[in-house]
Amino acid sequence: MSEFKRLMRLKLKMKQKRPEFKRQDWFKSSRIGTSWRRPFGKHSGMRIGLTHRAAVATVGYRGPALVRGLHPSGLQDILVNNVKELVAINPEIQGARIAATVGKRKRIEIVKKANELGIRVFNVSKQKQEEFLSL
């Protein structure tokens, strides 16, 4: 378990050091968004990797393989649409994220059942959970 915690801490440190990858020349025109596109230009300093240019997304920026894709709490993130899907979750290694398309009534049911089963719901705040449980 200590190895897992070490990797989670390493993942957090790597995330903090990871630069914000932005599209080449994103600041020159408002029509060009900031979302990442790989530079392909023949004379592109960014593509070549000149030190005074912005960072290019490469394999070296990836986090540790064992904890890649996990929630910062260390639990696996499972998307839930209804109570039936919630029952299939293992609370020791998985947590629930309620889908955006779920309405308030079903959301309340899911939160109540999750509390009963001891499952953590990632996208509902503690304050909202208490409010839902009191209904």
Curated annotation (Swiss-Prot):
Gene Ontology terms describing biological process: translation
Keywords carried by this UniProt record: Ribonucleoprotein, Ribosomal protein
Keyword Ribosomal protein: yes
Residue ranges crossing the lipid bilayer per the database entry: none
Cited SUPFAM superfamilies: Ribosomal protein L32e
Pfam families, per database record: Ribosomal_L32e
Source species, domain of life: Archaea
GO cellular component, one term: cytosolic large ribosomal subunit
SMART domains: Ribosomal_L32e
An MF annotation (GO) of this entry: structural constituent of ribosome
Family stated for the protein in its record: Belongs to the eukaryotic ribosomal protein eL32 family.
PANTHER family found in the cross-reference section: 60S RIBOSOMAL PROTEIN L32 AND DNA-DIRECTED RNA POLYMERASE II, SUBUNIT N, RIBOSOMAL PROTEIN L32
UniProt-listed NCBIfam families: PRK08562.1
Protein name per its UniProtKB record: Large ribosomal subunit protein eL32
Annotated source species: Methanococcus maripaludis (strain C6 / ATCC BAA-1332)
